């Protein structure tokens, strides 16, 4: 990992989502997403509450989020098209009202976005689009569970020339303008977080490889030796990446160089560039290490972000289930690619949850 002590001016990004459908047994509530084409690569999503009760959910990392998060998955000839945007880690308590959406039964919200701004579709041709996953639901501005969403499968024919003309949301500018340095308390906090990440990841890797089978089953939904080896390998890769501040595959900024932090975002990753950036909230909201099972802290947030970066371990993880209740509702194949599952498992190993 290359630790960046001087920020640089950067431009914008665009949408992120789950390529894997999430099944939640026995869930009476749900959100139905209807996708339609309104332009060559411009997509409209209508999200409907199909349940019988009002539901309040976090729309960050979902439709209505103005940040470049993944809202749909794209496929060409059954192969997923690379997404070039951000993956955000959010707070789970004290969420601001503007991060929440309440839908009455049968009510809808709409969102429009251009998929060519966040994926290279200049090749044109037939693209298949869908969107499935889990959305955190809240009570009194605190995440208390999750609700599943699923969409129709939409197939569109993309005009290559028109798609190529769409402005890319993610642009890494030349480092001509130096902004504030990472120093003082923030530098100290991040250095401590990295040291703690090394310890947590290494302990979790050992536990994954040869520790309690019941704990591994709780988080990863299997005890197969191949899955345990894969989890251990990813966690060891995270430990190795966090151990060096002068080399490695990622670049870590201690401040919001992209301008995508909000009052609810702790940190974010640009997987396509292997870049991680912390938000102000990372320092003001999170303890260095929590003493509470399943709670957030700086070390597990950094660990969470490292798992997103494919340069650390490929493929990078997604955000398929956020928080303990959603993460432990995933299947084994989904848990293996879910960032929060690794953070929660490391926390559980550290605190003997």
Swiss-Prot record:
UniProt-annotated catalytic positions: 305
As given in the record, the signal peptide range reads 1-19
| Gene Ontology molecular-function annotations | metal ion binding; metalloendopeptidase activity
What residues bind Zn(2+), as annotated? Answer: 304, 308, 319
Its UniProt entry gives the catalysed reaction(s) as: Preferential cleavage of bonds with hydrophobic residues in P1'. Also 3-Asn-|-Gln-4 and 8-Gly-|-Ser-9 bonds in insulin B chain
Tell me how the cofactor is bound. Binds 1 zinc ion per subunit.
List the InterPro entries hit by this protein, alphabetically: Fungal_M35_metalloproteases (IPR050414), MetalloPept_cat_dom_sf (IPR024079), Peptidase_M35 (IPR001384)
Q: One GO BP annotation here?
A: proteolysis
Q: What general EC class does the enzyme of this chain belong to?
A: hydrolase
SUPFAM superfamilies per the record? Metalloproteases ('zincins'), catalytic domain
Q: Which cofactor does it need?
A: Zn(2+)
Gene3D superfamilies per the UniProt record, alphabetical: 2.60.40.2970, Collagenase (Catalytic Domain)
Annotated GO CC locations: extracellular region
Q: Where does this one sit in the cell?
A: Secreted
Q: Which domain of life is it from?
A: Eukaryota
Q: Which family does it belong to?
A: Belongs to the peptidase M35 family.
PANTHER family from the UniProt entry: NEUTRAL PROTEASE 2-RELATED (PTHR37016:SF3), PTHR37016
| Task performed by this protein | Secreted metalloproteinase that allows assimilation of proteinaceous substrates. Shows high activities on basic nuclear substrates such as histone and protamine.
| Protein name as annotated | Neutral protease 2 homolog AO090001000135
Source species, please? Aspergillus oryzae (strain ATCC 42149 / RIB 40) (Yellow koji mold)
